[in-house]
Swiss-Prot record:
Residue ranges, compositional bias (Gly residues): 711-729
GO cellular component term of the entry, any: ciliary basal body
Biased composition range(s): Acidic residues: 596-605
Function: May enhance cellular proliferation. May reduce growth inhibitory activity of CDKN2A.
UniProt-annotated stretches for the region Small GTPase-like: 39-279
Keyword Cytoplasm part of the UniProt annotation: yes
Location of region: Interaction with CDKN2A: 655-693
Protein name as catalogued: Rab-like protein 6
Biased composition (Basic residues): 669-678
Alphabetized Pfam families for the sequence: Roc
């Protein structure tokens, strides 16, 4: 506001100021103001001198570009103005000041009233700005001497004043009134002779003579070019001053160098001492810094319960589970019974895949996962630890057990059914790298099983032996947990029924342990997945307990919805045509079921907990791509044949396992006989269809091998037939 007002006021007052400018003064042209605002490199002063009525003021106006005025108005005081001029095409901005000098000014006193009498003393008392008042040659770069060629006394003024001009100032003698040449009195030769004969010391500046006519602007170009001489002389003087300054600076620098040579800075011994002192000073802070980062790095690893271990575990898969074993159980114990504390320690070994799933699970069901987040990261750690590449990844027995343990209570079954689709989608996207959820569950189950049943697991690398050991271990783990969590047992029982007959007991035991942790939303889907797949794999073995398993899973209203859906999907070859919801759940469960079974079978032969032998990518790829039943039959027979080879040696063990599985299924069926009847019929039909679809030898091999692989987690072929059979159906 104020700036705008000032501008308005200034614009209003501008004309008044112009009016108040005294004689001999004027405001600078706007164009010149803009030009000089950028900066002025040179200030050049040109003085116009001459007798009265010789055309000084006319020349002064002409240099400004103003028109010629016929009327003669004597100038009372010195006038100064700036003109546009530049040296040829250079970018140097030169401010040229032209002075219209008055030798004797006549200043008239302006009174308020009428002048009544003449007072000579009063007139003399007043002074005007003229040549007598100041030295016009001070800082002058050029002089223009003017005379009237028709008047001799004007030339006498030149003869009198020219010698007074400083010798270093160039002078241009200009004979004006050339348009009145017929009346001329002074010839050009007379002027040149005078200039040439003028006594000037050597090195004096230049004198030039020219004629002009202000009426028709004749001679202005010559005068304009004459200004180059004062400019070049000014430039040379400026450069000389710069050279002098340069020389002075050079001398000063030489003096400084001579002094510097004698100072301590040039003493090499002192310099070395200073360098040593500096190095010591830097070394101490560096050491402190080096120590500080190590504690900093350690601190993040120690405080991080599950997530931190997940990040650190991939580098060191085995040591990571030990840390979570100590830290995870206390964290999980308050929200969940002690049975649940055991699975979390196993989980920490699978960090990377578990981490991504944890974030997804948190987004899907934060309420239910409030307690499970710590256990989830822990199981995820083991999977990645063993998996160095997609092809090398092989789920261990941990997957099946983890699925069973992760079974949530009946109340969470509905949520699990909805979440199963999301988890399946995640597992599908991650099929190549390995299903993080499946790997996490496998790790959890294996870790728990290893400490409790570690002696029986190493009993034999054979898949059948591993299966029996894993089932016994799971049964042991389940025993303490069954008491605290009866509801989860119901969920686990249908799951175990779906699974192979021998695996029913271990899943029951592990299921309660996981059920103790209701927060696992995807636990039910994962468990049910492996169980369903196992049931589909061993149709021959499932026959004895088929009726019991089906009845319990289908008739059990309290059982997890996801588990029921899985049972239908696994049993029905036409399940895809059924409800869209059932299809989604079935797809989710088979995908996870396959990884869980595969991990159990794979880990069994190599080492029960960590070393998976068979590559997971093939298994998951089949599940993801073969959800519609494409090419699963081929994978199934190949794997079944492989299992048959492996199962030939432990055929006795397989039979024993089958008997044990049948007994376990019968026990579970007795507990839930009402629910089992309904599912027995459906499962019997589905198993018949599977038998028809499967080749006879593959049925026998797959039935026995899959049971052994599922229980021991080592049979490589079991995982393929499990997922393949379901997909074929």
């Amino acid at each position: 506001m104020f700036s705008a007002l000032k501008k308005l006021v200034g614009s209003d007052q501008a004309p008044g100021r112009d009016k108040n400018i005294p004689a001999g003064l004027q405001s600078m042209n706007q164009a010149l103001q803009r030009r000089f605002a950028k900066g002025v490199q040179y200030n050049m002063k040109i003085v116009i001198r001459g007798d009265r009525n010789t055309g000084k003021t006319a020349l002064w106006h002409r240099l400004q570009g103003r028109p010629f005025v016929e009327e003669y108005i004597p100038t009372q005081e010195i006038q100064v103005t700036s003109i546009h001029w530049s040296y040829k095409t250079t970018d140097d901005i030169v401010k040229v000041e032209v002075w219209d000098v008055v030798d004797k000014g006549k200043c008239k006193k302006r009174g308020d009233g009428l002048k009544m009498e003449n007072d000579p003393q009063e007139a003399e008392s007043e002074m005007a700005l003229d040549a007598e008042f100041l030295d016009v040659y001070k800082n002058c770069n050029g002089v223009v001497m003017m005379f009237d060629i028709t008047k001799q006394w004007t030339f006498n003024y030149i003869l009198r004043e020219l010698p007074k001009v400083p010798t270093h100032v160039p002078v241009c003698v200009l004979g004006n009134y050339r348009d009145m040449g017929e009346h001329r009195v002074i010839l050009p030769d007379d002027v040149r002779d005078f200039i040439d004969n003028l006594d000037r010391p050597p090195g004096s500046s230049y004198f030039r003579y020219a004629e002009s006519s202000m009426k028709n602007s004749f001679g202005l170009k010559y005068l304009h070019k004459f200004f180059n001489i004062p400019f070049l002389q000014l430039q040379r003087e400026t450069l000389l001053r710069q050279l002098e300054t340069n020389q002075l600076d050079m001398d000063a620098t030489l003096e400084e160098l001579s002094v510097q040579q004698e100072t301590e800075d040039q003493n090499y011994g002192i310099f070395l001492e200073m360098m040593e002192a500096r190095s010591r000073g830097h070394a101490s802070p560096l050491a402190a810094n080096g120590q500080s980062p190590s504690p900093g790095s350690q601190s993040p690893v120690v405080p991080a319960g599950a997530v931190s271990t997940g990040s650190s575990s991939p580098g060191t898969p085995q040591p990571a589970p030990q840390l979570p074993l100590n830290a995870a159980p206390p964290s999980s114990v308050p929200p969940v019974p002690p049975s649940e504390a055991l699975p979390p320690p196993a989980c920490p070994s699978a960090p990377a895949p578990r981490r991504s799933i944890i974030s997804r699970l948190f987004g899907t069901s934060p309420a239910t996962e409030a307690a499970p987040p710590p256990p989830e990261p822990v199981p995820a750690a083991e999977g990645p630890a063993t998996v160095q590449s997609v092809e090398d990844f092989v789920p261990d027995d941990r997957l099946d057990r983890s699925f069973l343990e992760d079974t949530t209570p009946a109340r969470d079954e509905k949520k699990v059914g909805a979440k199963a689709a999301q988890q399946d989608s995640d597992s599908d996207g991650e099929a190549l790298g390995g299903n993080p959820m499946v790997a996490g569950f496998q790790d959890d189950v294996d870790l728990e099983d290893q400490p409790r049943g570690s002696p029986p697991l190493p009993a034999g690398p054979v898949p059948s032996q591993d299966i029996t050991l894993s089932s016994e271990e799971e049964a042991e783990v389940a025993a303490p947990t069954k008491g605290p969590a009866p509801a989860p047992q119901q969920c686990s029982e249908p799951e175990t029924k779906w699974s192979s007959i021998p695996a029913s007991k271990p899943r029951r035991g592990t299921a309660p342990t996981r059920t103790a942790a209701p927060p696992w939303p995807g636990g039910v889907s994962v468990r049910t997945g492996p169980e369903k797949r196992s049931s589909t794999r061993p149709p021959a073995e499932m026959e004895p307990g088929k009726g019991e398993q089906a009845s319990s899973s289908e008739s059990d209203p309290e059982g997890p919805i996801a588990a029921q859906m899985l049972s239908f999907v696994m049993d029905d070859p036409d399940f895809e045509s059924e409800g869209s919801d059932t299809q989604r759940r079935a797809d989710d469960f088979p995908v996870r079921d396959d990884p869980s079974d595969v991990t159990d079978e794979d880990e069994g032969p190599a080492e029960p907990p960590p070393p998976p032998k068979l590559p997971l990518p093939a298994f998951r790829l089949k599940n993801d791509s073969d959800l519609f039943g494409l090419g699963l039959e081929e994978a199934g027979p190949k794997e079944s044949s492989e299992e048959g080879k492996e199962g030939k040696t432990p055929s006795k063990e397989k039979k024993k396992k089958k008997k044990k599985g049948k007994e376990e299924e019968e026990k579970a069926a007795k507990k839930k006989s009402k629910h089992k009847k309904s599912k027995d019929k459906e499962e019997g039909k589905e198993e018949r269809r599977r038998r028809q679809q499967r080749p006879p030898r593959s049925r026998e091999r797959t039935a026995a091998d899959e049971l052994e692989a599922f229980l021991g987690g080592g049979a490589p072929g079991g995982r393929h037939p499990g997922g393949g059979d379901y997909e074929e159906l």
